[in-house]
Design a protein with these regions (language model features):
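Acidic-enriched, low-complexity/disordered segments with a strong bias for Aspartate over Glutamate
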Residues: 34-36, 55, 74, 85, ...
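Residue-level signal for secondary-structure boundary sites
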Residues: 125, 141, 186-188
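Substrate-binding clefts and catalytic carboxylate motifs of secreted carbohydrate-active enzymes
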Residues: 1-127
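Hydrophobic beta-strand positions in extracellular immunoglobulin-like domains
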Residues: 119-121, 135, 182
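Terminal connector regions
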Residues: 129, 159, 164-200
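Intrinsically disordered, low-complexity Pro/Gly/Ser/Thr-rich segments with frequent PxxP/GP/PP motifs
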Residues: 131-174
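Generic structural motif
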Residues: 106-108, 131-133, 178
Length: 200
């Protein structure tokens, strides 16, 4: 199989889309070794892209009051951008959406050596929250750790911590990542992680 084969291109309704997919794969990942890997990585990339948008919109509650993505499912067997295929199987985006659309969610945004750790509470009650923020290296050693206790008001989002980690990261930017463990008052936990460089 080949993404540029006549059969694959007949399913692609945007003439420049396959090139864009390959471009963004090359910006973020190493090039996949075969067609199956290419399909898989393109689905992971789709999930990461949609997550980035949703996280941004949730962090800007008040300016943006909701988000939907196109499209949920397929009505016939086809190669598509749907998050659930015709047979009801979840693709990477749908697994990711179940987490990033959770009523109580956390997210990390990185730029350079800076990280913004945020939380959203879409419930109708204020929620107390503990967030343990760590900078880890690829061997999982903890280089930095801080726990923040806060409350996220009902139907709101907050920045829990904003910090430039240049002093922690030093010259190891490609070998470290930010991690945030969110523990809500009802015991619900989730972990978010984000690198400071593209995944490749």
């Amino acid at each position: 199989c080949n993404i540029f084969s006549p059969v694959m291109e007949s399913h692609q309704k945007n003439g420049t889309a396959n090139g864009k997919i390959l471009y963004y794969i090359s910006e973020n990942f190493r090039y996949p070794k075969d067609f199956d890997s290419l399909v898989y990585v393109s689905q992971v990339l789709q999930g990461i892209a949609i997550k980035a948008g949703v996280d941004h919109w949730r962090a800007n509650r008040g300016r943006c009051m909701g988000a939907l993505y196109w499209q949920l499912n397929d009505n016939w067997p086809v190669a598509s951008w749907a998050s659930i295929d015709y047979f009801g199987r979840w693709k990477a985006l749908h697994y990711m959406a179940a987490r990033f659309f959770a009523p109580k969610a956390g997210y990390i945004y990185t730029e350079g050596t800076k990280a913004v750790i945020s939380a959203a509470n879409e419930t109708l009650e204020n929620q107390s929250l503990n967030v343990t923020v760590r900078i880890r290296d690829v061997e999982l050693n903890v280089l930095f750790e801080e726990t923040v206790e806060t409350t996220v008001k009902a139907q709101s989002s907050i920045h829990v911590l904003e910090r430039d980690f240049a002093d922690v990261i030093g010259s190891k930017k490609r070998r470290v990542f930010a991690e945030a463990v969110y523990t809500w008052q009802d015991g619900t936990t989730s972990t978010e992680a984000e690198s400071f460089v593209p995944y490749k």
